[in-house]
Amino acid sequence: DASGVAAKGATPSFYKNYDAIPSRGGMSALTMAGAVAGWSEALKISKEWQGGKEGLPLTTLLDTAISQANWGIEVTQSLTDASNKTFDDLAGDENFDQFLIKGKALKKGKILKLTALSKTLAHLAEKGLDDFYHGELAQNLAADLEAAGSPIRLEDFENYKAQRVPPLHVTTSK
């Protein structure tokens, strides 16, 4: 289970001046990202299943994603719709600008370059996945989130762990 958990600081007192948790912006970022820890745990499980043998190097596993993020992705209709829906709320937010093309809402068929994602993945390929939670990347992300108004702090990064849990199963027919 690599789902996000609420930041330690995401308390009622943190949001005391609000009727509800904001739906946009830094204060809405209140759950710790777990995907990278999930990748790390999956690699450990893979190694166990292979009798302790190492699988593909992390650089190889992330290379295509790094290249694709750097080259860019074609904007789909659903991404266009999401961009139009959030544009007025987030326009002018310096953190949102990286998800725009020349300061405008996304248009279907255009290419959106994800340079920051490419750099982050390249950093993880070089330093290892644990850097996301315990290294330079964790420190930078925590500082950026705090500056944006998020309750997530470095402590939340450092304390996050993916968990191995039994898979959910149900009987669908008899």
Could you say what each language-model-derived stretch is?
Residues 1-128, 132-134, 138-173:
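Noncatalytic scaffold domains of N-terminal-nucleophile
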